[in-house]
């Protein structure tokens, strides 16, 4: 049997083995290598309990016999191959299931609470244990997106966007558990599908079916903006006196030729937007101009940006998740495609604490946990939903969240190994 010379290394001090080459069978797979490392650790420490390990060669997870991986990566069998090993991530476990009255379109998790938006026209605030704390009513059509603005000792500001063409700025008094509509943000001429708050927590942007992006103040005030009503807007849906003071946008960004499906802030003065026109645009907020365009060949449904890896992830109707470097001179080149979903990818979210990991949801009813060092297959499929997955998110408390057209919000307990924590 052909042998390969390999040197094993790890960042995890307690699992380190001697830094010398070992001769191993070329056909070795994960289980074989894991057994070898455990035997070496047992020799060093008789009390060692077997651990499941994962292995990386040239920063890519081993998912096939070693020799096949080396051939795929163009690694010579004549040299000593460097193999990194990390403790295998355990599968996320479904923890809570929170029922809604209609589809769960959007989720925003924090350390303490979960905010959801639903097609039943309401938003809900949940405890991490799955208890409803507050139901927020006011929108006249389905809620499409929700997000937290800021939190202080007694209250939180939050936003909701709706098919009713408005965005609501709410104040939630956490001490008394009371909600107040502060501002009704008006100016879009179509469903508002995506909202995102900037790092200063003083501004937010929105993307709509009217093909426009708009930037708004997120700071509450006692002043009402003047808003000119368009004649084709149905008057029976106006309940502005109950919805807080009217607010109009600071600026409108025009450039997409189809609906804007997803928006985010990638820097203090930079916004990314994804559209049904097959393009992702990166905007300079100061000048209101497009800095660059990442062109696809199918509809983009969602984008997510990781400040840790400085990479953009996109999900499309062609079932693929693509990773981009928006700052590269060749920004339009896809770094990697994650291909496993069998339906439209509806939602992607980078982990807030692990630069290699992201989660995705799809019309195929599955939530998938990915590590970008394994582009060919997800780490895990989470198959809790009985219908389409519409939204995914993370909390800082180690939960993955997903909502779908089965009217359910699921939370999954997830603990990553220390070696995967991003800088």
UniProtKB/Swiss-Prot annotation:
WD repeats lie at residues 99-137, 138-180, 187-226, 255-293, 295-334, 340-380, 384-422. It is found in: Nucleus, Nucleolus; Nucleus, Nucleoplasm. Pfam families: NLE, WD40. The keyword Nucleotidyltransferase does not apply. SMART domains: WD40. InterPro entries: G-protein_beta_WD-40_rep, NLE, WD40/YVTN_repeat-like_dom_sf, WD40_repeat_CS, WD40_repeat_dom_sf, WD40_rpt, WDR12/Ytm1. Residues 4-87 are annotated as: Ubiquitin-like (UBL) domain. GO terms for molecular function: ribonucleoprotein complex binding. Gene3D superfamilies: YVTN repeat-like/Quinoprotein amine dehydrogenase. Its main location: nucleus. Belongs to the WD repeat WDR12/YTM1 family. HAMAP family: WDR12 (MF_03029). This is Ribosome biogenesis protein wdr12.
């Amino acid at each position: 049997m052909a042998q390969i010379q390999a040197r094993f290394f790890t960042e995890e001090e307690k699992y380190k083995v001697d830094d010398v080459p070992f001769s191993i069978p070329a056909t070795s797979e994960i289980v074989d290598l894991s057994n070898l490392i455990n035997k070496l650790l047992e020799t060093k420490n008789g009390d060692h309990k077997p651990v499941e390990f994962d292995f990386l060669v040239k920063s890519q997870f081993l998912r096939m016999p070693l020799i096949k991986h080396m051939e795929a990566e163009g690694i010579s069998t004549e040299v000593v191959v460097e193999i990194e090993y990390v403790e295998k991530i355990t599968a996320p476990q479904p923890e809570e299931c929170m029922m809604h009255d209609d589809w769960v379109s959007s989720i925003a998790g924090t350390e303490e609470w979960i905010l959801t938006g639903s097609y039943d026209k309401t938003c809900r605030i949940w405890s991490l244990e799955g208890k409803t704390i507050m139901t927020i009513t006011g929108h006249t059509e389905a809620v499409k997106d929700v997000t937290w603005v800021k939190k202080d000792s007694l209250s939180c500001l939050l936003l909701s966007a709706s098919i009713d063409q408005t965005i609501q700025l709410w104040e939630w008094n956490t001490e008394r558990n009371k909600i107040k509509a502060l501002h009704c943000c008006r100016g879009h001429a179509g469903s508002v599908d995506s909202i995102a708050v900037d790092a200063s927590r003083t501004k937010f942007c929105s993307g709509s079916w009217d093909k426009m992006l708009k930037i708004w103040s997120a700071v509450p005030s006692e002043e009402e903006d003047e808003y000119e009503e368009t004649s084709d807007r149905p008057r029976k849906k106006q309940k502005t006196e109950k919805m807080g003071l009217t607010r109009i946008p600071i600026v409108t960004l025009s450039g997409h030729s189809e609906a804007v499906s997803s928006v985010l802030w990638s820097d203090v003065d930079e916004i990314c937007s994804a559209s049904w026109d097959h393009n992702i645009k990166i905007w300079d907020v100061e000048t209101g101009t497009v800095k660059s365009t990442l062109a696809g060949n199918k509809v983009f449904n969602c984008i997510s940006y990781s400040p840790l890896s400085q990479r953009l992830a996109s999900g499309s109707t062609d079932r693929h998740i693509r990773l981009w470097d928006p700052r590269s001179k060749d920004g339009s080149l896809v770094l990697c495609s994650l291909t496993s979903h069998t339906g439209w990818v509806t939602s992607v979210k980078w982990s807030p604490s692990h630069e290699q990991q992201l989660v995705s949801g799809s019309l195929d009813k599955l939530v998938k946990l990915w590590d970008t060092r394994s582009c060919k297959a997800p780490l895990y499929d989470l198959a809790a939903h009985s219908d389409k997955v519409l939204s995914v998110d993370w909390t800082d408390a180690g939960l993955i969240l997903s909502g779908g057209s089965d009217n359910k919000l699921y939370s999954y307990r997830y603990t990553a190994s220390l070696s995967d924590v991003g800088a």
